[in-house]
Curated annotation (Swiss-Prot):
Protein name: Actin cytoskeleton-regulatory complex protein end3
A GO MF term: actin binding
Residues annotated as domain EH: 10-100, 139-227
Biological process annotations from GO: actin filament organization; DNA damage response; endocytosis; endosomal transport
Source organism superkingdom: Eukaryota
Similarity comment: Belongs to the END3 family.
Principal location listed in the UniProt entry: membrane
Protein's membrane topology: Peripheral membrane protein
Binding-site residues for Ca(2+), renumbered to this chain: D55, D57, D59, E61, E66
Function, as annotated: Component of the PAN1 actin cytoskeleton-regulatory complex required for the internalization of endosomes during actin-coupled endocytosis. The complex links the site of endocytosis to the cell membrane-associated actin cytoskeleton. Mediates uptake of external molecules and vacuolar degradation of plasma membrane proteins. Plays a role in the proper organization of the cell membrane-associated actin cytoskeleton and promotes its destabilization.
Organism: Emericella nidulans (strain FGSC A4 / ATCC 38163 / CBS 112.46 / NRRL 194 / M139) (Aspergillus nidulans)
Length: 404
């Protein structure tokens, strides 16, 4: 398995570029992204293929995750990591939130598993009869948690999206596929919510040692198509309602309850040890933008405090006015102007305009970005020093008041 991934520093850099181009919008259209992508000097036909691969949802625009995919492909092509644009995205480059789209695309292109229907001559020893279609409120809530954690944008579930759940169950693969075929008579690549809940209910009973039913009630089968399902079947027998009594032991006393292990791995049941495959953009550095907002707010607050302090100083006696102290308001104003200049310079570097437009030397651009970053850090340190000066002014004001 490849250990490649998009590093955090790459995500940060891509966010800077994306946010400068998007103008506060969540997507980039073709014309907005063209200026950055064409700076790579790749051929137009290569860029078209990169765009098609990165546009995972096929809406003709790139959100931030898709933009990261496009930028990584471009850099790998420019740096020789890829000899040509791949025909499909490698798994490590697929964003976790869009894995279902890639899976659906592969299924539609011919990669969808076609499960052989297994005739119901169940010879497995030790299985019990008495499957009940009734879903208790506790079971239904658990099924809905699993459904919500795996559904795609259309609210549907693919067979492969529940692989981690299958691994946690004491259910043979052939029975899992039989249950899928039972709730999916049209052999569609995905099923809706009602069919998913029925599928999970069948797996639940099989996990507890009951035989999989051979047929689905006609009314229930119709509900898969009408998107309406009755979970309180009149034919339910209370003695067979799994989970309705206080006994929390399973049929064997050793197996975990259906879905508990899986939900714990997902973090739904209070644990967060589950780590899905693919590129995780959940820690996308939009914090940098928020850091700018916080910094500007702190600067504004500091400016207001400085103005208040200066007004207090102006109220002192004439003999204490001209004591040779520096004009901190002027210094603060100059520091803000310098910060705005450096931010504008950084923005020009991101957009490929200004000085960066004259050349395509990536190393030089990286050095410029690092230099600007160091200068911004210097301004932050300067801000800290000014805060110290403000505290000194406050102490002087308090001392002056105390001496009166």
């Amino acid at each position: 398995m490849s250990n490649k991934k998009i590093e955090q520093w790459e995500v940060e850099r891509y966010w800077e570029i994306f946010s400068s181009l998007a103008g506060g919008q969540p997507h980039l259209n073709n014309s907005q992204a063209a200026s950055v992508l064409r700076n790579s000097r790749l051929r137009d036909d290569q860029l078209e293929k990169v765009w098609d691969l990165a546009d995972l949802d096929g809406d003709g625009e790139l959100d931030f995750e898709e933009f990261c995919v496009a930028m990584r492909l471009v850099f790998d092509l420019v740096n020789g990591e890829l000899p040509q644009v791949p025909k499909s995205l490698p798994d490590w480059l697929v964003p976790e939130s869009k894995a279902h789209l890639v899976q659906a695309t592969r299924a539609l292109s011919g990669g969808q598993e076609q499960f052989e229907r297994i005739e119901d001559e169940d010879s497995t020893p030790g299985l019990k009869d008495g499957f009940d279609w009734y879903m208790s409120p506790e079971d239904k809530a658990k099924y809905e948690e699993i459904y919500s954690a795996n559904k795609n944008q259309r609210g549907e579930i693919a067979f492969g999206s529940l692989e981690p759940l299958y691994e946690s169950l004491d259910v043979p693969d052939t029975d899992i596929r039989s249950a899928w075929n039972l709730v999916n008579p049209s052999a569609a690549p995905e099923i809706n919510k009602d069919a998913t809940l029925a599928f999970l209910h069948i797996l639940n009973y099989r996990h507890e040692g009951y035989r999989i039913p051979r047929t689905i009630p006609a009314s229930l089968r119709a509900s898969f198509e009408n998107n309406k399902i009755d979970y309180q079947l009149d034919s339910a027998r209370p003695a067979q309602k799994w989970g309705t009594n206080g006994d929390t032991e399973t049929s064997t006393g050793r197996k975990a309850k259906f879905g508990d292990t899986y939900l714990s791995r997902l973090g739904v049941a209070g644990k967060t040890s589950y780590t899905p495959k693919g590129t995780d953009f959940s820690d996308t550095i939009q914090d940098e933008e928020w850091e700018k907002v916080r910094l500007r707010r702190e600067l504004a607050e500091l400016d207001a405090k400085l103005q208040a302090a200066n007004k207090a100083v102006e109220g002192r006696k004439a003999g204490n006015r001209n004591d040779g102290r520096p004009n901190w308001v002027l210094i603060k104003k100059e520091a803000l102007q310098l910060l705005e200049y450096k931010e504008r310079e950084l923005r020009e570097l991101r957009e490929g305009s200004g000085r960066a437009k004259a050349g395509g030397d990536v190393e030089r651009l990286r050095e410029d970005v690092r230099t600007v970053g160091e200068q911004v850090d210097g301004l932050k340190n300067h801000l800290i020093q000014r805060k110290g000066v403000l505290e000194d002014l406050r102490r002087e004001i308090e001392d002056e008041r105390a001496s009166r």
